[in-house]
Amino acid sequence: MAAAATASTGTKGVVRQVIGPVLDVEFPAGKLPKILNALRIEGKNPAGQDVALTAEVQQLLGDHRVRAVAMSGTDGLVRGMEAIDTGSAISVPVGEATLGRIFNVLGEPVDEQGPVKTKTTSPIHREAPKLTDLETKPKVFETGIKVIDLLAPYRQGGKVGLFGGAGVGKTVLIQELINNIAKEHGGVSVFGGVGERTREGNDLYEEFKESGVINADDLTQSKVALCFGQMNEPPGARMRVGLSALTMAEHFRDVNKQDVLLFVDNIFRFVQAGSEVSALLGRMPSAVGYQPTLGTDVGELQERITSTLEGSITSIQAVYVPADDLTDPAPATTFAHLDATTVLARALAAKGIYPAVDPLDSTSTMLQPSVVGDEHYRTARAVQSTLQRYKELQDIIAILGLDELSEDDRRTVDRARKIEKFLSQPFFVAEIFTGMSGKYVKLEDTIAGFNMILSGELDDLPEQAFYLVGNITEVKEKAQKISADAKK
């Protein structure tokens, strides 16, 4: 039974109309439920089938009727069935007991691991933190991943858009971030699967168990809670599951005073579900068929993701761009809320450079001298200009070869190739299939390392020494090993 139903007011209504996932319920005069209240319908239909579902009130229609959207399939639901107003919004379990578990939009566990060992629940609809409670000073969230920390740093309590096709390393990057926030920041993570494939959710769960992010033997040692409303679910579930995941994250931030990572995969599906619900409720569509409340819907979710004086929720959101059209209202509205973008490039993955984060396409509002400091800013811009020059020279190299370049350009190419290799690093969660121990690289080590490459101090070291290492000390050790092996 849904957690929301535990606070039942007992006001009973009758289902009068069912159109797909939308139902109209009639209540006694003066006892209408509030908008966003959860209604619970349980019982047997005339055919003897068990029916149990929760719906959320969306509209008050007049004539003592409300219109609600179901959070699960309405198969078997018939007119005349009894609906109970729970008196509150949908509520989900929160706290440490959620770690290592998989929930649906209603906070019910769906992983066959038994009931959740907590009585603490929280409603999924809440106000965003007050302005006076916010942490206003921008602070960089160190991930320990060189390419991100140097070129597109994340803001603590900020929102990051994650762009990338299939098979370029999104899942491994997500796992590494979850691992690093747990080990280095003492934080936890919440994963919200919004309208994506069930198979992907299952694969992710199995990979989390393999990499130790979820400890199957002792769930209390797990570092992530998962909340799924996948492609096969009704639009109501897909529209609200992001809020369910966010509510779990808010508890860790506000009550446990922790730094939290919230992953949303995929934020576009949240908008898409809102569009479907809007049409079902009979609202006039807006541009490209989206809901007229698009900006409000996205804003209500995004404004709750922030840093407070107590803790922070840093959100990483996979963004699907329909037909690669960045001007589509859904991605365009999302972009307005993002502080950074991390773009994964197939060309880098093909070269074996992991993480395959594109150093030229990825951006961050944090990369400015007033926030990260002059040295970090100068180093990042020098790295980008070196890589950009290398990109411009690639056509000439392909046609005429390296020998036709000027001395300066040859030096630039040599350093750019070392930079490109040095942007790769071994991940902790990938140890099981690379056989290499993972590396967490401190920001100061990252900056110092790239400065040494740019200054020419390391021009005499072989390019291969920079590949899949942590800091510059490891580069030098690897170079000595390569040199020793060559002499044998």
From Swiss-Prot:
GO terms under cellular component: plasma membrane-derived thylakoid membrane; proton-transporting ATP synthase complex
Membrane topology category: Peripheral membrane protein
InterPro entries linked to this entry: AAA+_ATPase, ATP-synt_VA_C, ATP_synth_F1_bsu, ATPase_a/bsu_AS, ATPase_alpha/beta_chains, ATPase_F1/V1/A1_a/bsu_N, ATPase_F1/V1/A1_a/bsu_N_sf, ATPase_F1/V1/A1_a/bsu_nucl-bd
UniProt keyword list: ATP synthesis, ATP-binding, CF(1), Hydrogen ion transport, Ion transport, Membrane, Nucleotide-binding, Thylakoid, Translocase, Transport
Positions contributing to ATP binding: 164-171
GO MF terms, alphabetically ordered: ATP binding; ATP hydrolysis activity; proton-transporting ATP synthase activity, rotational mechanism
Catalytic activity from the UniProt record: ATP + H2O + 4 H(+)(in) = ADP + phosphate + 5 H(+)(out)
SMART domains given in the database record: AAA
Gene3D superfamilies, per the entry: 2.40.10.170, Bovine Mitochondrial F1-atpase, Atp Synthase Beta Chain, Chain D, domain 3, P-loop containing nucleotide triphosphate hydrolases
Localization of this protein: Cellular thylakoid membrane
Record EC number: 7.1.2.2
Family: Belongs to the ATPase alpha/beta chains family.
Known partners and oligomeric status: F-type ATPases have 2 components, CF(1) - the catalytic core - and CF(0) - the membrane proton channel. CF(1) has five subunits: alpha(3), beta(3), gamma(1), delta(1), epsilon(1). CF(0) has four main subunits: a(1), b(1), b'(1) and c(9-12).
HAMAP family recorded: ATP_synth_beta_bact (MF_01347)
Role noted for this protein: Produces ATP from ADP in the presence of a proton gradient across the membrane. The catalytic sites are hosted primarily by the beta subunits.
Name by which UniProt lists this protein: ATP synthase subunit beta
Gene name per UniProt: atpD
